[in-house]
C-alpha cells in the first residue's frame, strides 16, 4: 500500500439558471389560466416545454369558494415571482387564457390581480398575449334549445 494521501479536486459549483451578462434579462413565459373556479400561474421556459413553477389560487387559500379570488391569485403570483428569482428568471412574457371554447371567453376575477402582483414583485413584463381558445365552429353549448332560464 502506498503511503501518499489522496487529494480531492475542488468541484465546480452548479449554478441554477442561465449565464447572463450584467443588465441582461432572462425571460420565461407565464401562462395565466383564469377561470371562474381557480387561477393557475404556470411558468415555463421560452419553448414552453420545461415547467419551472406552477402554483394555483387553490394552493394558497383554505376555502373552495376563494380559489378564483383576486387575493388567492395575488398570493400565488407572489410565490411564483419569488421562485422565478431563485431560478434566475428576471422577466416574463404573459399568456393569459380564459376558459374559452364554447364556454365563457372572459378571464376570471384572478387574472388582473395575478398580472399586477407579478409586475409589483419586481418581474419585468415583456409581451402580454391573450391565448383564449376561440372556436371556429363549436360543439353545441349546454343549456338546450330554449337556453338557461333564470
UniProtKB/Swiss-Prot annotation:
Disulfide bonds: none annotated. GO terms for biological process: ribosomal small subunit assembly; translation. Transmembrane segments: none annotated. It holds the Pfam family Ribosomal_S11. One of its GO terms (cellular component) is cytosolic small ribosomal subunit. Residues 141-150 have a biased composition (Basic residues). GO terms for molecular function: structural constituent of ribosome. The keyword Cell membrane does not apply. It comes from the Eukaryota. Residues 129-150 are annotated as: Disordered. The keyword Ribonucleoprotein applies. Keywords: Ribonucleoprotein, Ribosomal protein. NCBIfam families: PRK09607.1. Belongs to the universal ribosomal protein uS11 family. This is Small ribosomal subunit protein uS11y.
Amino acid at each position: 500500500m502506498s503511503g501518499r494521501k489522496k487529494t480531492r479536486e475542488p468541484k465546480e459549483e452548479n449554478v441554477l439558471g442561465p449565464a447572463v451578462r450584467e443588465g441582461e434579462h432572462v425571460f420565461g413565459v407565464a401562462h395565466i389560466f383564469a377561470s371562474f373556479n381557480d387561477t393557475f400561474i404556470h411558468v415555463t421556459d421560452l419553448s414552453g416545454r420545461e415547467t419551472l413553477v406552477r402554483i394555483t389560487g387553490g394552493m394558497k387559500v383554505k376555502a373552495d369558494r376563494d380559489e378564483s379570488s383576486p387575493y388567492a391569485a395575488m398570493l400565488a403570483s407572489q410565490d411564483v415571482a419569488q421562485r422565478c428569482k431563485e431560478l434566475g428568471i428576471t422577466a416574463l412574457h404573459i399568456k393569459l387564457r380564459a376558459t374559452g371554447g364554447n364556454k365563457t371567453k372572459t378571464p376570471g376575477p384572478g387574472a388582473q390581480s395575478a398580472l399586477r402582483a407579478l409586475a409589483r414583485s419586481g418581474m419585468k413584463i415583456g409581451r402580454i398575449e391573450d391565448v383564449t381558445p376561440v372556436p371556429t365552429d363549436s360543439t353545441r353549448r349546454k343549456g338546450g334549445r330554449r337556453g338557461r332560464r333564470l
